[in-house]
Regions:
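Short loop/turn motifs that connect adjacent beta-strands in outer-membrane beta-barrel proteins
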Residues: 21-32, 44-45, 73-82, 130-153, ...
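Hydrophobic, lipid-facing positions within transmembrane beta-strands of outer-membrane proteins
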Residues: 30, 64-70, 119-123, 154, ...
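Outer-membrane beta-barrel "beta-signal"
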Residues: 121-134, 354, 423-435
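Residue-level signature of outer-membrane beta-barrel architecture
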Residues: 74-76, 86, 127-129, 160, ...
Length: 435
């Protein structure tokens, strides 16, 4: 009897200690964060045999983009949170965001006007249902209230957000405001993820998260037109579905993650082959639009190699039968790189990144461009096909807490898959501040 009492008493003490530890760390009821990012890009003249409507301009160019975002959040009840993100954006991309499938500025996807524009980027509700396991403390961050959550949990997100907020994450290559800035490095370039011209959508996502694995699914709205700003309200007919499985592992005691993604988009997309059949010379894919499905998938791996060094790899594919609709004109992609913190040279918060990308097209897509067809981002009027290859490197200098300055270089071989144009070098500077 005394032994049972002692065990119960020890259990009571442990529970009290756990509660006391939780009391030492605050649980936020509301939060306010912000960011601003200024990116300037330059490329000089480069060789070209010809150009078309969607070509990268061969003469010298300098363009700048700016965004500023406010991240406001509030806890409604246990597990229930709401977030609002008003955003300011201004600027233009090189050549009007044309002429390179793996475009050079990941921030410009959110910029649709040279004038300063205020809009709502996100307004979403998140409900977390605890399923047990060790309690974890989550630090305060953008769109994340500080507090405790179960190691195993079910997370429901509903409203206006970005698909990239939830899917295809990567510790080393996902955020153009602080990491690599090429479009094909912020996510799987062959995933035509549902989004308006600013990179956001409406929809619902559900995540089952456990200590060693996670399963995610989402149903998201597509734009009404290719690369358009208004979303298609026919949600039962036009939408994008995505499923992702994530598995954590350790390689020689170093953490890593592998993610498998599959998607199917349903939208009013045209067919490359139908456009060619209707007009073998100068085909117009917009004349063949009807409700169609695009399918694809991707592999995403991240691996810590040392305390200050990590590596990543992505591979992506889609069927390439219907026109690119929401992101960019990439049907196959392979990318990989490394990220090194500056502790080895006395700059622990600095980051050096180097990555390579190889993008490709389906046979239908390349035949369409070779016949003089145009998409919403590439098309030189004719095509001497070659894979678009890009090398990107950046150095991020931590000035003070929250403020970083970056220098970025991108070398692009066969821009827009055309051996008759380029190569071209793009230099970028980035100023990023967050609180």
């Amino acid at each position: 009897m005394r032994r049972k009492v002692a065990i119960l008493f020890c259990g009571f003490l442990l529970a009290c200690a756990a509660r006391a530890e939780e009391a030492d760390k605050p649980e936020e009821t509301y939060s306010l964060h912000g960011q601003s990012t200024l990116i300037s890009q330059y490329h000089g003249g480069f060789p070209q045999a010809y150009s078309g409507t969607n070509s990268l301009v061969a003469r010298r160019e300098i363009k700048t983009s700016f965004t500023a975002t406010l991240f406001a959040g509030a806890r409604l009840w246990s597990g229930g949170e709401i977030y609002l993100n008003p955003e300011l954006a201004q600027g233009r991309g090189l050549s009007g965001v044309l002429g390179v499938a793996g475009f050079t500025n990941g921030e410009i996807a959110r910029v649709s006007s040279p004038d300063l524009t205020l809009y709502r980027a996100r307004l979403f509700f998140r409900q977390t249902f605890g399923l047990g396991g060790n309690r974890e403390y989550v630090e305060a961050d953008q769109n994340q209230l500080a507090g405790y959550q179960d190691g195993s949990r079910l997370v429901l997100t509903v409203g206006n957000f970005s698909a990239l907020d939830i899917f295809d994450d990567n510790s080393y290559s996902h955020e153009p405001r602080s990491q690599f800035i090429n479009w094909a490095l912020l996510t799987n370039g062959a995933w035509d993820f549902p989004a308006d011209a600013r990179g956001y959508t409406n929809g619902v996502a559900l995540e089952l998260i456990n200590p060693g694995w996670a399963l995610r699914g989402g149903l998201l709205m597509e734009p009404r037109e290719a690369n358009g700003l208004p979303l298609d309200n026919r949600f039962s007919k036009a939408h994008g579905g995505v499923v992702e499985l994530e598995r954590s592992y350790a390689l020689q005691d170093r953490p890593g993650k592998v993610r498998l993604l599959a998607y199917a988009n349903r939208a009013n997309m045209g067919s490359y082959r139908a456009a060619l059949a209707a007009s073998p010379i100068g085909p117009d894919i917009t004349q063949t639009r009807r409700l169609s499905t695009k399918r694809g998938g991707g592999l995403n791996v991240e691996q810590q190699l040392a305390d200050d060094l990590g590596a990543f790899l992505r591979a992506g594919w889609n069927d390439g039968k219907t026109e690119s609709w929401a992101f960019t004109e990439i049907d196959r992609t392979l990318s990989g790189g490394i990220s090194l913190k500056g502790a080895r040279w006395g700059r622990a918060n600095d980051v050096l990144g180097v990555a390579g990308i190889v993008n490709g097209l389906s046979n239908d897509h390349r035949d369409y461009l070779a016949a003089g067809g145009y998409g919403f981002i590439v098309g030189d009027g004719q095509l001497n096909y070659g894979r678009e290859s890009i090398l990107e490197s950046y150095y991020s200098l931590a000035v003070v807490k929250g403020l970083s300055l970056s220098l970025d270089y991108q070398y692009i071989q066969n821009p827009a898959y055309n051996k008759d144009r380029g190569p071209v070098s793009v230099w970028s500077s980035r100023i990023h501040y967050e609180f």
